[in-house]
Structures are given as structure tokens and as C-alpha cells.
């Protein structure tokens, strides 16, 4: 239902409603990520990448310990959808699915940390916070794992590579020159041939910003904005130079010929 009627739900989000999502175990053969025992384990982790990718605030579990008479041998019609842990005489036994759910929540926290770091970087007087979309970079990165609600990457190697990218970008924001680069459309979007990209962002005062070879002026607040054609390799290359250092930032796009 969320994917089918997402436009309606998104409108409610924009009006201030908090949106969570839910999966049903009996549909585990569908194309959406799930957390039952008979789907790839990484899907339990991907659920929270989907949360960040679409601005959702939570995931509703049908049950934590709603066991069958023998949860070890009889997962039930919903294939373990009603529990993430197993019973023992003196407590609970953890599960791999529960651990991956925890890892997915921690991945979400890394994306939130990146958003918070961007917020702190651009905080101050002027129009910075009205122009910079704080979650935009995290959404771009998360889209490498979750492209749509039913199109997602199940490769653990790719997930770890993307998580490393989040960590590197978090650390990079502490290194001069500080710069936030955003594009419209988002990085990794599919665009028409000869399409121009809106490039905008913020850089710390005194930074020289060059985008695909064109020098851009900065406002008193450090804001910049320009409509730029893609390079031959379908990228936007932003070079930032300051007396304290240099940076080179690349944003890539898919081109439809």
C-alpha cells in the first residue's frame, strides 16, 4: 500500500504527519524487502535504509515474541514474522535477523549524523538553512542501496562500501574548506542527454568554487548556485580551494540517450 499510494502518503508527510511502514510476512515472495526467515538476511538491514531514503520515521513490527508452539521448527504461515528472538528457560536467544535489524538502525543513525553535521556546518544568519536541504545528501547516498521501494541492492559488499562513503563524508566535513554541494535532480538520477543540472550549496568564506571549469561567485553567506551542463563522463565536478586546503567533489548521473 505504501508504494502504491506513496504520493498520498507523501502529501500527508508534507503537511506534518509522521509516517511509518509495515511489512506482512505472507507476502515474502514479493519484490519488497522483508524480515522473514526465508528471505536474504540483508533485507532485515535494508528496511531502515528504506526508512531514510523516503523520510519515514519508523518500522512497525507485528511481533517480537509471538511464537508458535515450536518457533525453532515451525516458523508458521508468516515464516517467523511474529518474532525476532527465540525462547529459552532463563531468557531469550538472539537471532541473526535481529542483529541485522540492529545494524540497519545503526546505518540509519550514520545517515542522520551526516544530516546533523550538515545542519551544524551551515547554521548561522542568512538564507543558508532555507536553501540547503539537510537530508538531501543522505538520501542520495541511501539511493545507492534503495533506489525505489521494490528496487534495492542486496550485495553486502556494496552496502559496506556505501556505509564507508557516509563515514568518509562525515569526516570530510571537518576538513577545510568546508563545502556542501547539492544538485537538482539528485545524484544518480537518470536525466536526458544534454540536460543541465542545478548545482547549489554553501562554502566557508574565502573559498573559490569552480564547477565543471566555471568559477562561481559566492554570496556574503557563502551560498552559490548555477545551472551547469554535465561533463562528457556524465558528472558534475566541484573544485573548492581555500588558503587552508583543497577539495574535489564529484556527482554522477545516468544519461538517457
Which residues are covered by each model-predicted region?
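Catalytic-core regions of glycoside hydrolase
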Residues: 1-68
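Generic signal for short, ordered secondary-structure residues
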Residues: 29-30, 90-93, 188
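Short secondary-structure transition/capping segments
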Residues: 32-34, 71-75, 217, 221-224
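Short, structured secondary-structure boundary patches
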Residues: 39-44, 78-86, 229-242
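Catalytic domains of carbohydrate-active enzymes that cleave complex glycans
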Residues: 56, 71-177
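Extended hydrophobic-aromatic, low-complexity segments
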Residues: 70-71, 192
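Ser/Thr-rich low-complexity repeats and stalk/linker segments
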Residues: 176-257
Amino acid at each position: 500500500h505504501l508504494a502504491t499510494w506513496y504520493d498520498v502518503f507523501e502529501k500527508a508527510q508534507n503537511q506534518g504527519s509522521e509516517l511509518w511502514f509495515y511489512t506482512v510476512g505472507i507476502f515474502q515472495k514479493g519484490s519488497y524487502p522483508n524480515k522473514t526467515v526465508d528471505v536474504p538476511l540483508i533485507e532485515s538491514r535494508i528496511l531502515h535504509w528504506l526508512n531514510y531514503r523516503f523520510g519515514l520515521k519508523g518500522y512497525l513490527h507485528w511481533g517480537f515474541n509471538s511464537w508458535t508452539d515450536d518457533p525453532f521448527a515451525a516458523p508458521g504461515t508468516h515464516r517467523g514474522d511474529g518474532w525476532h528472538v527465540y525462547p529459552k528457560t532463563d531468557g531469550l536467544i538472539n537471532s541473526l535477523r535481529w542483529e541485522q535489524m540492529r545494524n540497519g538502525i545503526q546505518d540509519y543513525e550514520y545517515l542522520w549524523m551526516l544530516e546533523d553535521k550538515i545542519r551544524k556546518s551551515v547554521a548561522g544568519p542568512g538564507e543558508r538553512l532555507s536553501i540547503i536541504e539537510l537530508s538531501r545528501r543522505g538520501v542520495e547516498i541511501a539511493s545507492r542501496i534503495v533506489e525505489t521501494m521494490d528496487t534495492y541492492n542486496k550485495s553486502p559488499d556494496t552496502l559496506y562500501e556505501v556505509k564507508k562513503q557516509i563515514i568518509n563524508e562525515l569526516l570530510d566535513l571537518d576538513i577545510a574548506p568546508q563545502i556542501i554541494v547539492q544538485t537538482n535532480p539528485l545524484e544518480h538520477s537518470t536525466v536526458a542527454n544534454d540536460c543541465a543540472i542545478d548545482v547549489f550549496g554553501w562554502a566557508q568564506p574565502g573559498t573559490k568554487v569552480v564547477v565543471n571549469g566555471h568559477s562561481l561567485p559566492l554570496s556574503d553567506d557563502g551560498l552559490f548556485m548555477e545551472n551547469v551542463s554535465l561533463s562528457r563522463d556524465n558528472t558534475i565536478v566541484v573544485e573548492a580551494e581555500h588558503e587552508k586546503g583543497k577539495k574535489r567533489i564529484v556527482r554522477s548521473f545516468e544519461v538517457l540517450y
